[in-house]
């Protein structure tokens, strides 16, 4: 799948646990592979994967195949699921990121708009990853115990500016989150 994505001519980046692992080296079991693309790039993504992969839209649990008949999604905050064929397991979860004029827009804080290059970083492998403080914000809203080790591994590596951005975002999104006391 990495080769397929490397040839995709639009921005994409790894998110979730893979982004935390790339930032920290902290390894854990991954349930799936999550990437993100700008919602405006869905037609290009569907065209790129066409003929080799089945791409489905998952909007609120409603699945719909994307291809010649449907090339776009109705909800720019939804997901795409990718698999090799109709009976194969899903191999990729594509989280759609709303955009404004091709600028990344935070799903939780819509006033946070930035170029993709500012909210992602290139790893040693050449792959782009969502900045760890943004990943932690998304994880914080879910309040899952499995995300605490990611926070523990990431916190010492965050710069003062990254900590401040996370603190400000947490205050707006999850003001009573227990991570506040450690930032």
Predicted regions, residues:
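Compositionally biased terminal segments of proteins
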Residues: 1-183
